[in-house]
Amino acid sequence: MNVVIVIPARLSSNRLKEKMLADLEGAPLIVRTWQQAMKSRLANRVVVATDSERIFAVLRDAGAEVVMTSPDLTCGTDRIAEAAEQVGGDVFVNLQGDEPLIDPATIDLAIAPFFEDGPMPDCTTLVFPLKPDERHIIDDPHVVKAVLDAKGNALYFSRCPIPYRRETLPDTRYYRHIGLYAFRADVLKAFVALPPSMLERTESLEQLRLLENGYRIRCIETTTDTPGVNTEEELEEVRRLFRERFGS
């Protein structure tokens, strides 16, 4: 089975200007993310999909495989799908380009279910357990929460605190969604061909398009948190953590 990690990398970003090219201990942020992805044991190939000649050149010089995609794409999954048409494969992993501290084993958690006996999943993603008393996280609309069924499939994703806590119960589980996905190739192609759904537009969460159209998203629990980079403060924190983990 051919598993391809695709890292979407736009030059423009809303909150931190040109963050993909921000320096992280001597190399651009996107290069550091690509380096971590290359350590995956279950992926056969790592490709960066970009709309920027500058990012393309930086990654090419670093030895990465890079493909150019349209600058008119509206979301990262569209960029993944366009890259998938160019490179081919059976399973495609969508790894965010601003996660240079991603543990390769965490990536492999999302890939592993595709190697299990039985039908392959439509899509997999990761969730991080939260404690019921972490209300500042659960109530934060910038943190996406997930509710799962008994088999680990997503019932719903929301920016609201779900499940709603009418009573405090010891077995109530809260999960924060981690935006790493692995798609079966045919599901990825079908996903981008579907119009944005009502719930997707309401919550501004594209994964709801899959659920509304009857696809299942298998959620795998991880206890490894991965910080992204959206602000200058987060970039400084990632630099500090990078030095701790890898040295300066």
Curated annotation (Swiss-Prot):
Pathway(s) served: Nucleotide-sugar biosynthesis; CMP-3-deoxy-D-manno-octulosonate biosynthesis; CMP-3-deoxy-D-manno-octulosonate from 3-deoxy-D-manno-octulosonate and CTP: step 1/1; Bacterial outer membrane biogenesis; lipopolysaccharide biosynthesis
UniProt GO BP: CMP-keto-3-deoxy-D-manno-octulosonic acid biosynthetic process; lipopolysaccharide biosynthetic process
Keyword Ubl conjugation attached: no
Subcellular location: Cytoplasm
EC top class, as a word: transferase
Gene Ontology CC, one term: cytosol
InterPro entries, per database record: Cytidylyl_trans, KdsB, Nucleotide-diphossugar_trans
Alphabetized UniProt keyword annotations: Cytoplasm, Lipopolysaccharide biosynthesis, Nucleotidyltransferase, Transferase
Catalytic activity entry: 3-deoxy-alpha-D-manno-oct-2-ulosonate + CTP = CMP-3-deoxy-beta-D-manno-octulosonate + diphosphate
Principal cellular location given in the protein's record: cytoplasm
A GO molecular-function descriptor: 3-deoxy-manno-octulosonate cytidylyltransferase activity
Gene3D superfamilies tied to this protein: Spore Coat Polysaccharide Biosynthesis Protein SpsA, Chain A
UniProt-listed Pfam families: CTP_transf_3
Biological role: Activates KDO (a required 8-carbon sugar) for incorporation into bacterial lipopolysaccharide in Gram-negative bacteria.
HAMAP family in the record: KdsB
Entry's family note: Belongs to the KdsB family.
UniProt protein name: 3-deoxy-manno-octulosonate cytidylyltransferase
Taxonomic classification: Bacteria, Pseudomonadati, Chlorobiota, Chlorobiia, Chlorobiales
Encoding gene per record: kdsB
